[in-house]
Amino acid sequence: MSYNYVVTAQKPTAVNGCVTGHFTSAEDLNLLIAKNTRLEIYVVTAEGLRPVKEVGMYGKIAVMELFRPKGESKDLLFILTAKYNVCILEYKQSGESIDIITRAHGNVQDRIGRPSETGIIGIIDPECRMIGLRLYDGLFKVIPLDRDNKELKAFNIRLEELHVIDVKFLYGCQAPTICFVYQDPQGRHVKTYEVSLREKEFNKGPWKQENVEAEASMVIAVPEPFGGAIIIGQESITYHNGDKYLAIAPPIIKQSTIVCHNRVDPNGSRYLLGDMEGRLFMLLLEKEEQMDGTVTLKDLRVELLGETSIAECLTYLDNGVVFVGSRLGDSQLVKLNVDSNEQGSYVVAMETFTNLGPIVDMCVVDLERQGQGQLVTCSGAFKEGSLRIIRNGIGIHEHASIDLPGIKGLWPLRSDPNRETDDTLVLSFVGQTRVLMLNGEEVEETELMGFVDDQQTFFCGNVAHQQLIQITSASVRLVSQEPKALVSEWKEPQAKNISVASCNSSQVVVAVGRALYYLQIHPQELRQISHTEMEHEVACLDITPLGDSNGLSPLCAIGLWTDISARILKLPSFELLHKEMLGGEIIPRSILMTTFESSHYLLCALGDGALFYFGLNIETGLLSDRKKVTLGTQPTVLRTFRSLSTTNVFACSDRPTVIYSSNHKLVFSNVNLKEVNYMCPLNSDGYPDSLALANNSTLTIGTIDEIQKLHIRTVPLYESPRKICYQEVSQCFGVLSSRIEVQDTSGGTTALRPSASTQALSSSVSSSKLFSSSTAPHETSFGEEVEVHNLLIIDQHTFEVLHAHQFLQNEYALSLVSCKLGKDPNTYFIVGTAMVYPEEAEPKQGRIVVFQYSDGKLQTVAEKEVKGAVYPMVEFNGKLLASINSTVRLYEWTTEKELRTECNHYNNIMALYLKTKGDFILVGDLMRSVLLLAYKPMEGNFEEIARDFNPNWMSAVEILDDDNFLGAENAFNLFVCQKDSAATTDEERQHLQEVGLFHLGEFVNVFCHGSLVMQNLGETSTPTQGSVLFGTVNGMIGLVTSLSESWYNLLLDMQNRLNKVIKSVGKIEHSFWRSFHTERKTEPATGFIDGDLIESFLDISRPKMQEVVANLQYDDGSGMKREATADDLIKVVEELTRIH
């Protein structure tokens, strides 16, 4: 068995469909967006889109249509999934709670039938008499719409026209009538049929039109008064209604294929059209009024409005605003203007919605050396191509920033006694102090009476009896608030300089070298109570009051130089309660007593970024439970702040971190800032609930996210990225990309638009000694699109394209790796290519090119001709492992800097994927699943260990551990194969057993080992082993991790219980949705826990939680089973959410 947990780290972002209507109420205008398995419901308001609800469907949404049957006050939603579940949904709201009610449901899959190549089509008769589905060739499926039917039942009508391209119901027909484009050996034709519900048959339709354009691909049914249909082709747009026929062939639409359309006006006089290049057109139907008052179509006109993201779907909302749903780039809200701008465009983007899809490749890197992976993806395609940098952390939203270098500390003040909010910020520098007045959002420098400005401040704040305090290197100064004047000052008796200080509302402790002085704050008086001498100099101290001690701290925490110790002293006597030797050479720089979730802690940060934390007993001053984490490489300063009414600690360093507690465990979360030296909380009128943060050069005021989430940065390339790798020595990424160029009259090609490879700082072009013939142009015609492939070298800090290297004509770059080879000290970028010609079934030649990038130059070090396409390449024990068409080949790197073949393995159809671990190689084949090879270094050859004999068409593979291998295949499933080392016969040993099966519902393009969260920080009790991330076509990022058997069984039990409690939208069974499903077989899911379902436990109500845990047996780590409580499971699930 294999025990795995699969969970979503980023939900799918690519938009597959969108509709608009009145779903939430008759008055609301709604936009509904489908992102694969997720349905998002928005209300269209004057301010933009307001999200109402997000629904996770147990299925890939294939069809989504709003309709309003007679007698309904608002629209209902029809959904069909890829596994042929159908449902009719209704929106119900009572108070705050929103429900999506399933009015009717069913499954319309046929036992036999060939799924149509042109995909699933679902249409609804305008009079809401029936739903029509085209799922299989030669069949038209009808679901009659009766109001009372809870179960949706369908019947098939045979369709002689096997190859239907598109079909729609016509408007204004007595009987439901379909109009469709179909193809036969003679070409493409348009035909209509009436659908008879009684006979369950087709009757002859009102009209037909033979031999329309050969590329006719879309039918648009036109409402009355015109009626009829518009047929859209590659070059022409035609209108038919039986007695009228109109055709136009505007040259403007010829450049690209129209892929989506949407009606603007209810009467069908205007339509939006979107094409593959992201151009947006308006199709206008001009009317002519006849003498008898009827309206006929006079003319068709097409106008280019401008450019948008490449649209998968369009929907017109209101007031000239259009939603552009994109699968290949970010989706947009655009405004259509009456007048064009300077570029001649009528389209203005108002808002963009991030889309990571399609994720074609990705790599995990720790760029800032922060012990936390960032994911860099190759996302999008064509002009929407980009790199996306994704990291998990707590975001800071900047509201103001001031250039102020050299800040050594900062504190908020309420200078006016009658204020609830801060109005002043005090900044400390070496040898001086400056005061900033906050007036609304304005910030100006000012002076405070009673404060000194020519010394460095160690502490400043509001204290008891309406007073302010300023502790500088020279003295402790007490200042009255009203009027502002110095009322008391304390200096060290020999006038020595204060080195560190800590203060709360009524107590002060200062250190002068080894001496400690304890003062109390009284009205207009600082009273020295006691002092003591330590054996070493004091490096840091803290007297934060904990518990309910009336704001007084009975304890003082100090860190000492020389013996590197942390100590807890009793006030006022300075009696030593506890001494903790921290060990090592590095001095403590910051110490803090704090309370998280009513447990008291002592935190002590050293000068090298290490942080010790202990449990603190405030009665006895004893420390317990010592733990250590590393939070950076530089001295760390600890400050508390409050967020969501809980205490948090901000650790300022070169790797700023927020420390908080969850389930009585400390959690350390990255803050998405490069560096923070000092911070303080700030709550002023202009900047409520904010933080002030200082680095070496700048003061920033901002607000902080309440939760950790994924932050996405976009680097547009304007061309298609294919592969990415990271090279640490040159601090660069290598990216393979392709741009589209068009053949011109001279036989050359021209780029369609500027993009990353045409705008690089420097560039070079391949010239190969290997293929003399390849440079002779193959047959291409004028206006034909060709792909031009490049290797881009991209700076890891600025993401600037430093160099672009263009490959040969017709040469496709397929694989990329950065590695060292043999004993050669250099690190190389190595690219595998193929010469691709349309007349060849598969590539017959390609090359492996070895590049070195150093000092801003890219040099070709070696090239090797191969007889085929170099699909994947990986570094393998100092050698280069590549697969060329069906052969897996190992090259060694000679001292002459040449690649020499060492050994081959031939037993594949097309070896598309390679992963290695030690001497083992996992090969993923186009159609023959996975195979495990072992390299024998003594013999210098490959041995076939075992293979999976199931015919899986692979899309990605990964090695989980020595015995478990993860695969993704093209029917959206995941599986795990296991090597059976204990098998007794050779035959059994050669079989990889499928021990894990799961329907993911996503097409996985890439797996890679790595994590999006901080590694090894804090404590965790969830025994998850390893972390493999995956990226999909829909822009989803997921994670697979391995579990122990006992945890797997607990979560499986929990999953089954959750399925009884959580009602699925559309009444689709979870077990049906997750069952492994291909055209060959369907098997129940096994070996995988659905993490998304487990995490939904946190969102359900308390009574439902109780229902889930009833009689659930749980081992709390003591080895004994007991009945679980809801809180036990909340803890378990919260821990699991922290892995992504």
UniProtKB/Swiss-Prot annotation:
<feature type="modified residue" description="N6-acetyllysine">
    <location>
        <position position="1067"/>
    </location>
</feature>
<dbReference type="GO" id="GO:0005737">
    <property type="term" value="C:cytoplasm"/>
</dbReference>
<feature type="modified residue" description="Phosphothreonine">
    <location>
        <position position="1125"/>
    </location>
</feature>
<keyword id="KW-0007">Acetylation</keyword>
<dbReference type="InterPro" id="IPR004871">
    <property type="entry name" value="Cleavage/polyA-sp_fac_asu_C"/>
</dbReference>
<dbReference type="GO" id="GO:0005634">
    <property type="term" value="C:nucleus"/>
</dbReference>
<dbReference type="InterPro" id="IPR011047">
    <property type="entry name" value="Quinoprotein_ADH-like_sf"/>
</dbReference>
<dbReference type="GO" id="GO:0043161">
    <property type="term" value="P:proteasome-mediated ubiquitin-dependent protein catabolic process"/>
</dbReference>
<feature type="region of interest" description="Interaction with CDT1">
    <location>
        <begin position="2"/>
        <end position="768"/>
    </location>
</feature>
<dbReference type="GO" id="GO:0006281">
    <property type="term" value="P:DNA repair"/>
</dbReference>
<protein>
    <recommendedName>
        <fullName>DNA damage-binding protein 1</fullName>
    </recommendedName>
</protein>
<comment type="pathway">
    <text>Protein modification; protein ubiquitination.</text>
</comment>
<keyword id="KW-0238">DNA-binding</keyword>
<dbReference type="Pfam" id="PF23726">
    <property type="entry name" value="Beta-prop_RSE1_2nd"/>
</dbReference>
<feature type="cross-link" description="Glycyl lysine isopeptide (Lys-Gly) (interchain with G-Cter in SUMO2)">
    <location>
        <position position="1121"/>
    </location>
</feature>
<keyword id="KW-0090">Biological rhythms</keyword>
<dbReference type="GO" id="GO:0031465">
    <property type="term" value="C:Cul4B-RING E3 ubiquitin ligase complex"/>
</dbReference>
<keyword id="KW-0832">Ubl conjugation</keyword>
<comment type="subunit">
    <text>Component of the UV-DDB complex which includes DDB1 and DDB2; the heterodimer dimerizes to give rise to a heterotetramer when bound to damaged DNA. The UV-DDB complex interacts with monoubiquitinated histone H2A and binds to XPC via the DDB2 subunit. Component of numerous DCX (DDB1-CUL4-X-box) E3 ubiquitin-protein ligase complexes which consist of a core of DDB1, CUL4A or CUL4B and RBX1. DDB1 may recruit specific substrate targeting subunits to the DCX complex.</text>
</comment>
<feature type="region of interest" description="WD repeat beta-propeller C">
    <location>
        <begin position="709"/>
        <end position="1043"/>
    </location>
</feature>
<dbReference type="GO" id="GO:0003677">
    <property type="term" value="F:DNA binding"/>
</dbReference>
<dbReference type="InterPro" id="IPR018846">
    <property type="entry name" value="Beta-prop_RSE1/DDB1/CPSF1_1st"/>
</dbReference>
<keyword id="KW-0833">Ubl conjugation pathway</keyword>
<keyword id="KW-0963">Cytoplasm</keyword>
<dbReference type="Pfam" id="PF10433">
    <property type="entry name" value="Beta-prop_RSE1_1st"/>
</dbReference>
<comment type="similarity">
    <text>Belongs to the DDB1 family.</text>
</comment>
<dbReference type="GO" id="GO:0048511">
    <property type="term" value="P:rhythmic process"/>
</dbReference>
<dbReference type="GO" id="GO:0016567">
    <property type="term" value="P:protein ubiquitination"/>
</dbReference>
<dbReference type="GO" id="GO:0006511">
    <property type="term" value="P:ubiquitin-dependent protein catabolic process"/>
</dbReference>
<dbReference type="Pfam" id="PF03178">
    <property type="entry name" value="CPSF_A"/>
</dbReference>
<feature type="region of interest" description="WD repeat beta-propeller A">
    <location>
        <begin position="13"/>
        <end position="356"/>
    </location>
</feature>
<keyword id="KW-1017">Isopeptide bond</keyword>
<keyword id="KW-0597">Phosphoprotein</keyword>
<feature type="region of interest" description="Interaction with CDT1 and CUL4A">
    <location>
        <begin position="771"/>
        <end position="1140"/>
    </location>
</feature>
<dbReference type="InterPro" id="IPR015943">
    <property type="entry name" value="WD40/YVTN_repeat-like_dom_sf"/>
</dbReference>
<feature type="region of interest" description="WD repeat beta-propeller B; Interaction with CUL4A">
    <location>
        <begin position="391"/>
        <end position="708"/>
    </location>
</feature>
<keyword id="KW-0227">DNA damage</keyword>
<keyword id="KW-0234">DNA repair</keyword>
<keyword id="KW-0677">Repeat</keyword>
<dbReference type="GO" id="GO:0042752">
    <property type="term" value="P:regulation of circadian rhythm"/>
</dbReference>
<dbReference type="GO" id="GO:0045722">
    <property type="term" value="P:positive regulation of gluconeogenesis"/>
</dbReference>
<dbReference type="InterPro" id="IPR050358">
    <property type="entry name" value="RSE1/DDB1/CFT1/CPSF1"/>
</dbReference>
